[in-house]
Amino acid sequence: MKTSQTLPICTLLGSLFLTAASTVEPVNFFGRPYRLASYNQKANAMWEFTAPNETVTNWTTLFTIVDRPDARTPPDLDRLAQGILDAYKAKGGKVLLAKTMKDSTGKPYNYIVVGFDQPAQKRFELNFVKAALGPKNAYMAIYGVRVTDPKDYVAKAKAFLNERSTEIGKELENKKVPALETLPRREF
């Protein structure tokens, strides 16, 4: 097939994503709007929201929602949390906190904080994860932060954790994610 014949298909697919992404309301986190930047359904449907002027390949903060239809009960949620921990550890993450908590209504959720040391980029990536049961099944809400400092990024990341981790945890606890069935999905 000639390139000139494939270009319209690529253009069409790109415009379909832009149309779907543009119809999704931004997710607000700490009063800052995050717009849908990517979504896929590889293993589980996942939507990544970026702050203004950032992309999924070049971000300093990222808000991600993952649909987990495989978890529908509290024991399923515990297994999901263990799987999250195992996956992060397998990718070199250092688990800084893993705890079952209760929201203001008394509903339990799992809260996990994981750090990734990225010395080549002189940064520490921190993932704050809430795994909870929604109306139909579990979901994960992940707030990612990349802390960078050319002189001492590790010290800056520690200071960030000391100063901000409590408020990030509270913001995640109270965060209402969009109804997952309203978010775009790719048809295969």
Description of each model-found segment:
Residues 1-5:
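Positively charged n-region of N-terminal signal peptides that target proteins for export
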Residues 8-16:
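Bacterial N-terminal signal peptides
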Residues 17-24:
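Bacterial Sec-dependent signal peptides at the C-terminal "C-region" and cleavage site
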Residues 62-104:
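Mid-chain, structured segments of secreted extracytoplasmic proteins
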Residues 89-130:
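Signature of long, low-cysteine stretches enriched in small and polar/charged residues
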Residues 124-138, 144-145:
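A short, surface-exposed beta-strand/turn
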